[in-house]
């Protein structure tokens, strides 16, 4: 599918982003809050065609609906300061206008003879180009990042696989790798050398020190310096702090993938 964006250009446009998902719920049932919170929104680069802004939307499935919206970013004439998530102060130099979300049902996709072009892959993230568009953080002053890519069927873990990636840091540090309610600590050597990391489900522990059984149904993947794991409701366990304060420059990552055993 191709989406066309009609944006107000009476004010200079800094850039346009298009996000889309096939995790939208259209079955008429009560909202699946877990799915709603875990949806993975793909980013689609925007270009111009015959004087209009357009974006191609490669799909993985014809059995799920398509939800899509656009963000249009404009520069502010003067900076504006305020308070954001968790009362953190900020100064904005631009503002964002989001479109109304457009929805295409499975029947509409099939009637339009939409083609599926995405295939399963073990490479979850190459950390190239605009990769940050598909990751997020509630604390932009820190380097820690999260993604729901692992919730998408395109990146389903093969049976018996490990999650692997490479990381490079200037100083020795303790890296926290998180999956849902579990996390693992990884000792980094530093010295600006690429270090290969491989982790099994049992390397991830929750606040009760219980290991992750397998990769099935995982929803969120995180990389950070520290995080606090919360025990489930009714548990006698206490919150568990994982990791340590970061030293030096933010780390670099490459080749996040599932590695078959």
Regions found by a protein language model. Name each.
Residues 1-20, 30, 39-51, 56-58, ...:
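Surface beta-strand/loop "capping" patches
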Residues 12-22, 27, 66-70, 176-177:
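Beta-strand-rich binding/interaction modules
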Residues 30, 36-48, 188-201:
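Extended, solvent-exposed segments with strong compositional bias
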Residues 58-63, 204-208:
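Short, surface-exposed loop/turn segments at beta-strand-coil junctions that are enriched for proline
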Residues 63-77, 219-223:
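Short, aromatic- and glycine-rich surface loops/edge beta-strands on solvent-exposed regions
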Residues 77-121, 247, 254-255:
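Short beta-strand elements
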Residues 123, 135-217, 222-240, 246-260:
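Extracellular ligand-binding interfaces
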């Amino acid at each position: 599918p191709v989406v066309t964006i009609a944006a107000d250009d009476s004010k200079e446009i800094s850039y346009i982003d298009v996000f889309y998902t096939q995790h939208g719920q259209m079955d008429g049932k009560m909202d699946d809050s877990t799915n709603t919170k875990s949806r993975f929104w793909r980013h689609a680069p925007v270009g111009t065609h015959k004087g209009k802004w357009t974006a191609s939307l490669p799909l993985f499935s014809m059995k799920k609906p398509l939800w899509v919206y656009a963000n249009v970013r404009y520069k502010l004439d003067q900076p504006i300061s305020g308070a954001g998530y968790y009362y953190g102060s900020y100064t904005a130099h631009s503002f964002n206008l989001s479109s109304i979300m457009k929805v295409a049902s499975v029947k509409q996709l099939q009637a339009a003879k939409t083609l599926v072009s995405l295939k399963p892959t073990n490479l979850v993230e190459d950390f190239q180009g605009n990769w940050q568009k598909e990751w997020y953080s509630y604390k932009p002053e820190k380097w820690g990042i999260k993604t729901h890519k692992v919730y998408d069927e395109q990146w389903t873990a093969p049976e018996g696989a490990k999650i692997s990636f490479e990381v490079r840091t200037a100083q020795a540090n303790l890296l926290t790798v998180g999956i849902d309610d579990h996390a693992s600590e990884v000792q980094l050597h530093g010295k600006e050398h690429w270090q290969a990391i491989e982790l099994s489900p049992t390397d991830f522990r929750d606040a009760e020190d219980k290991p992750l059984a397998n990769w099935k149904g995982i929803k969120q993947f995180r990389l950070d310096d520290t995080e606090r794991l919360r025990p489930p409701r009714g548990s006698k366990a206490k919150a568990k702090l994982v990791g340590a304060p970061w030293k030096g420059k933010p780390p670099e990552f490459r080749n996040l993938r599932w590695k078959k055993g």
